[in-house]
Amino acid sequence: MNRRLDNQRVIRAPHGSDISAKSWLTEAPLRMLMNNLDPDVAEKPSELIVYGGIGRAARDWDSFDRIVASLRKLEADQTLVVQSGKPVGIFRTHPDAPRVLIANSNIVPHWATLDHFNALDKMGLMMYGQMTAGSWIYIGSQGIVQGTYETFVEVGRRHYNGDLSGKWILTAGLGGMGGAQPLAATMAGASMLAVECQPSRIEMRLRTGYLDRQAASLDEALALMEEAARTKTAVSVGLLGNAAEIFPELVRRGVRPDIVTDQTSAHDPINGYLPKGWTLAEWEAKRASEPKAVEQASKTSMVGHVQAMLDFHAMGIPTLDYGNNIRQMAKDMGLANAFDFPGFVPAYIRPLFCRGIGPFRWAALSGDPEDIYKTDAKVKELLPDNKHLHNWLDMARQRIKFQGLPARICWVGLGDRHRLGLAFNEMVARGELKAPIVIGRDHLDSGSVASPNRETEAMKDGSDAVSDWPLLNALLNCASGATWVSLHHGGGVGIGYSQHAGMVIVADGTDDAARRLERVLWNDPATGVMRHADAGYDDAIGCAEANGLDLPSLAR
């Protein structure tokens, strides 16, 4: 019996102001857990898979039911402990402590290999939590849209005089994260050709408005890119195919995209990447019966994929790894120069991290989109001079379809996050919003992750692999009063390659919530400034000084 499969269930988060838990502080994680498994949100909800290969919300359906039951009975001074998607304990703590503590996929470093994880996973002892899947704060593809948009805009600024009109981006992968790419590209003014091997993913992105259209062939897709470039219009096109075949074919034809990247689930060579020449049915069958053969075939295919990206890079085309660890997989298979093109964080995003700026997000527990529109207006009111952010919010309202509970992603940093959180809390208190707001972020943030092939690649002081920082981030968020805190391993780039922490906090309109919000939403981004200042980045040191951070090691 497969305890992870239930084709009969359809999970959706409750809407409205009536709650089934004892307070909003426990109703919030309950709704966000359920929201992660909404069919409009999750990639494979019947298997508890939210996104990112096999990133799950709960270990199995029995664990899901027990988590739900535990949250519904949890008292205001109790904390639920969740070990890799299974509820293992309820303890007496205090009202300002987190209501839920989550640890996912963590393995002692010597044993932190994909093989060992897969063995534990098969035994039912662990699950893969990705980043926001197992920490219950995934909001659909919107969760990464702005970060991807900001990256594309920065590429345009650096390489194309700030104008991406008439340019097109080649990429692959339209899953939960990669599915944000087409919309981010067109928002930035560029066209996109996105290769995807699974028809259901193309269909979902078309249905949710993240993708404009599908091409029937590579020739048609290229014709659409040429037409868009000629007319300087922005269009996103999905192409059913395998990137390991399409990318090299484009090199062979001499096709020159303007930007090249990739968001296939290469971090998981068994469950996330279709080997070259294989059918989906063959892949599905052999993942269970011959996982090592699948892994070998997938990683061999990645070599050709990455070599094509290297070829584009050699042509002078801006080419970037978007954090799926595909370069490492290719290098493991003997492609020595796989890292010759950069990752997106050191190339384009790190200056934001130095100022504690990252993917701040919130969701309306009421389920009413008007609550999000009202908070959008509040953000504009509080940050009147940030025209770039205003433009983003306007585009987001116009072009992003909500998946599950209405939510918003908005990159802001130290000094602004706590102000927004307090303002949202006041709106709840005054009855301007129909229910409380949950505020969280991706684990991809300035101070919450150690990932040498992504967020902490090429750190100035060589501290790429130091993972004390996400541990300290999680501990500080617990001490500060976050509503739930998570500590994960392997998100984004796969098992063995990252450690990262998440936090979520509820704005329920109370004075107690205001005190917690002020602490958490200051301290959380401040750890990012601290981490980058400690590594010697002048922007971070300046930000720390400007905000009065007390960093003893940098005292002059």
UniProtKB/Swiss-Prot annotation:
Belongs to the urocanase family. One of its GO terms (cellular component) is cytoplasm. Catalyzes the conversion of urocanate to 4-imidazolone-5-propionate. It catalyses: 4-imidazolone-5-propanoate = trans-urocanate + H2O. It comes from Bradyrhizobium sp. (strain ORS 278). GO terms for biological process: L-histidine catabolic process to glutamate and formamide; L-histidine catabolic process to glutamate and formate. The active site is at 410. Binds 1 NAD(+) per subunit. This is Urocanate hydratase. NAD(+) binds at residues 52-53, 130, 176-178, 196, 201, 242-243, 263-267, 273-274, 322, 492. Pathway: Amino-acid degradation; L-histidine degradation into L-glutamate; N-formimidoyl-L-glutamate from L-histidine: step 2/3. It comes from the Bacteria. The keyword Membrane does not apply. Its cofactor is NAD(+). NCBIfam families: hutU, PRK05414.1. Pfam families: Urocanase, Urocanase_C, Urocanase_N. Signal peptide: none annotated.
